[in-house]
Amino acid sequence: MDLSGECLDVSFEIDEEEESDSVAIPLFRNVLYQKTAYYSELIEKELPGVPVLAFHSYKGGVGRTLSLLAFVKAWSELNNLGNGQKLLIIDADIEAPGITWLTMKQEEAAFSFLDLLEITQEKDSTDEIIELIADKVLELNVKIETERGRAEHIVLPTYRYVEQLLDMYASPESLAISYNKKYILAEVLSKLGEKINAGLVLVDLRAGLSEFSAPLLFDPRVKKYLVTSTSYQSVKGTGILLQQLSKGLPLNENSKIPEVLLTMVQNGMNTAEIISELIAAYYPNAIEGDDSIMDDIVTELPFS
């Protein structure tokens, strides 16, 4: 409609409570187009509860879950089996659960990772979430065999029943795109671990460039272990992961720099070229710092 000589007043209202645009969305599809993979205010900060360690791999079948369980056994033996602090072990491999099967000999689990995601999607307060779920998680005790005997830890399975797995209400990805919840998952896991008196939280993530894994991978407060075999495709894929995970990350002792576990190393195999290639993947996008930090960034694990 043409009204000659008339003008329309336009006013803008700014909500001071709105989430800042500088808060990066921790998903691969977003990080790809950013200079940094991380929300700068979180770099070099700690989680509010106990440390969270995430085990990830580009490919399946390279020993990621076995590496996590080896960590559990080593922790148990160093901490006097039943007398030490328990670990909270979470099966976050939503598309191919593995650790969940440790709980399948028992009755239906009282609680699951998918339950945790649903409650976190619905509630805004991390303290309220923890109060709702802590008692149920404490019921999830599982005995794990070690060389020195049985150790008891808390294992949070992916799901309670198959239908829950096939028809998900919430996922790590849906949390990452929710208002003010981009980095809530790591905070909930950390505070949950503290509430149930766990020493650490260990998370077995979905393999690949999966948005189900991205929210924890791109939270700079989470310690990451990337597991790769010596195969060509596994090493190349791990290099892609490292390039994305190192974007904007200072290479210094205050950063939780992703570490690599090189598995299935045959006796007598020369891995120097593989290790050099993996270390080189950190540098194009990272903020360079102390190069000595990178000396032990790759750990070789023999084939057994």
Where do the protein language model's features map onto the residues?
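P-loop/Walker-type NTP enzyme "switch/lid" segment
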Residues: 94-194
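Short loop/turn segments at strand-loop or loop-helix junctions that form parts
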Residues: 155-161, 229, 301-304
